Structures are given as C-alpha cells and as structure tokens.
From Swiss-Prot:
It comes from Drosophila melanogaster (Fruit fly). This is Krueppel homolog 2. GO terms for cellular component: endomembrane system; endoplasmic reticulum; membrane. Its main location: membrane. It is found in: Membrane.
C-alpha cells in the first residue's frame, strides 16, 4: 500500500505564498505613487508659479481671518492688516495675469479700472488703515474660500489619492454654494457703505473713506464679469418697495425717498457691460 502524500498542504502553502506576492506587487505601485506625490506637487508649483502663489496667498487670507476671530497667536490689528496685504498681493498678481504690459494710455487705464482685480486692490487700500472690522474681512474671506477650494481640488486630482475624501466633500459643498457665496459677498459690500459712513463720523476712518468706497461700489455695480452686485441692489430695491407698501405714509415716504436717492447715485450701464 502506498503511503499518504502531503500534496494538499503544499498546494495551500503555494496559494498563500502567491497571494502574498500578489499583495506585495499591488502595494509596490501604491508606495511608489505615494513617494511621487511631493515630486508631482513640486513640479506643478514650479510650472504654475503665479497660480500656486495665488493659492498660497488665499490660504493665508483664510488663516489670518481665523486669527482675527481667534486672536491667539497675533493681535486683531496685525491679522487684519495681513489680510488686507494678502488681498492686495492677490489682486496685483491677477492684474499681472490679465493685463498686458503697462502703457500710459487711455485704453490701458480704462481696461485697468474695468478689471475686478483692480477693484479688490482698491478695496484693500481703502480699509488698510481703518479700525479692524470683521464685516470688512467677510468679502475678502469668501472670495478666498471660493477660489482656494477650486484650486485645491485641482491639486487633489493631481495627487490622485482617494484618501482625501473629506477635503473633496468640503470642496464640493463650497462649489455647490458658489452662487450663494457670491451673493452674500455682494450684500456685504453694499452694507459696508453705511458702515464706512459711521466709521467716518466716529473718527475711526478718514472723511474721504465713504467717498472713495462709493466709487468702489460704482465699479462693482458696473462690473462686466460679476453681475451679483447689480442683482443685490435690485433685490434690495424690491424688498424696500414692498416694505414701503406695508408701512404708514410717513415711513413709506422716507423709504421711497431713500430708494430714489440710491437710484440717482447708480451709474448708467453701457450696453456692452449690460450684455456681458
């Protein structure tokens, strides 16, 4: 009689070894891919220096705004000034991207003042030396969150790791609420106008601050790329007209007088700007 053989255990051991080898082979590409992530990011940053600098500056805006709300590592005045400086640097880089070489001509100046980035740089210059206020920081913060999220998603796609699902989920929420974020920014810019007047009367800002900010609002209202300021003014007008219809005659007259005053201050849109 033949002795029993040990073939089944050997086959199980061979299968175990083969499965271990296959798992090791699968882990090797993942490890090499994770090791290539810093190199990919570094190459991307070197190739897209301006866009990467804009992304970093927007992250600084978010960080210093949080530092303003929670002044643990720095004072509120310092955090406020750094947000304004970072916003001015962002606007300067965007103007460098969008405008040709400087030329002292009427066409160049007209194109310069039509750019949204020029408006945001003017915004930083207006409020750089005033008393710090969270209301002034909100428009800068919302713009930075919106644009930094978009570029962060591009970096996550470049890395190609699914482990960052939490960041992708937050970015998807921001992009889904992009219209509401731009709308909230427009309303904040409008509400800052009476706030600037109050600051001037309380000697917390210069007397020319409301005047200069009015010209800023005029440029935002005439923006060709961002219709949200015009839409915000239209919504406020509808709201106050409805409020005047429900108010007593004396209050209704005051409200309608304010609506007429704001309408007279509104600029006349050019046909090209209205179409865009």
């Amino acid at each position: 009689m033949s002795a029993p053989t040990d073939q089944p255990p050997r086959s199980e051991g061979a299968q175990t070894n083969s499965s271990e080898r296959s798992s090791q082979q699968q882990e090797q590409p993942q490890q090499s891919q994770s090791q290539n992530v810093p190199a990919k990011l570094l190459q991307h940053f070197q190739t897209n220096r301006i866009d990467s600098a804009l992304w970093a500056l927007r992250l600084l805006v978010i960080f210093f705004t949080v530092s303003y709300v929670l002044p643990i590592f720095t004072s509120q005045q310092s955090a406020f000034s750094k947000v304004m400086l970072a916003n001015a640097a962002i606007s300067a880089l965007r103007l460098h991207q969008r405008l040709p070489a400087f030329a002292f001509s009427r066409e160049f100046l007209a194109r310069l003042f039509a750019e949204d980035s020029c408006h945001y740089m003017m915004y930083s210059l207006i409020f750089f030396n005033i008393r710090p206020s969270l209301l002034v920081l909100i428009p800068v913060l919302l713009y930075s969150v919106l644009h930094a999220s978009s570029y962060s998603l591009k970096l996550l796609d470049l890395i190609g790791q699914n482990s960052w699902w939490g960041a992708r989920f937050i970015i998807s929420i921001v992009e889904f609420q992009a219209a509401n974020i731009l709308k909230a920014t427009a309303f904040c810019e409008i509400f800052i106008m009476p706030y600037a007047i109050v600051l001037a009367f309380m000697n917390h800002a210069g007397l020319m601050t409301p005047v200069i900010y009015y010209h800023y609002l005029v440029m935002r209202y005439s923006s060709r790329r961002n219709p949200y300021p015009r839409n915000a003014f239209a919504e406020l007008r509808i709201t106050f007209e409805a409020l005047a219809a429900r108010s007593p005659p004396a209050f209704a007259k005051i409200i309608r007088g304010g609506i007429g005053f704001v309408n007279r201050l509104a600029p006349q849109l050019q046909p090209a700007a209205a179409q865009e």
